Amino acid sequence: SHTILDAERNATYHSVHGAIQESRHVYMAAGLHQWMQNQPGAAVLNILDVGFGTGLNALLTLEATQPKPLNIHYHAIEPFPLNEQEIKGLNYCAALQRPNLALPFRRMHFAMENKPVAVSPQFALYRHSTTVQDFRYPQVFGLVYYDAFAPGVQPELWTVKVFKHLFNLMLARGILVTYCCKGDVRRALLAAGFRIEKIPGPAHKREMIRAVKE
């Protein structure tokens, strides 16, 4: 499955070892499915995606929740959205063998700023062209996908201050998942108030982090 290179930062939006595989492991299995297991019978889930990028996490979330009686409010932070040519080049719906998701996926990418778009009857997406540091919203989020570029590329996104800001946006028992398991990141999350779970990572990554607000 495709990934995209950000030439300015010399970093890819997803693992070069398979974008779909990585996102399913880190964000779906360790995040979304864990939240649903913890909150059986919940009717609504507010998700914050820090680093919308290619939109893959949103697409996989739509795929995973469509058959369930769960209303998703999906807030996507992306200060540098992809251009139309890059979006057209993404092959995720074909790779998933889900051509029926192609139109909803396109709706996600062309959503108006700060206005919900009904991707499906149970999935509303909100686009926020701001940085995580400047993002302001009520305390409603049960799940955070932290998919920013790595600390070596954007160290300013992996600080105690940023994680404390996210902590304050989340509900009790909320979950934050990220592919990064560096010691500095674990310590910053702990200092922000989270309980840390180190769990097996996707291919070519030994560990990842699931952080819980208790």
Where are these regions (language model features)?
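Core SAM-dependent methyltransferase catalytic element
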Residues: 192-214
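Conserved S-adenosyl-L-methionine
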Residues: 48-53, 78
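A short SAM/SAH-binding and catalytic strip from SAM-dependent methyltransferases
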Residues: 141-156
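Rossmann-like AdoMet
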Residues: 1-45, 62-96
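Glycine-rich SAM-binding Motif I of class I
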Residues: 55-59
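S-adenosyl-L-methionine
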Residues: 86-138
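A short glycine-rich, Lys/Arg-flanked "PGG" loop and its adjoining helix->strand segment in the class I
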Residues: 156-173
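Conserved beta-strand signature within the Rossmann-like core of class I S-adenosyl-L-methionine
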Residues: 143-145, 172-180
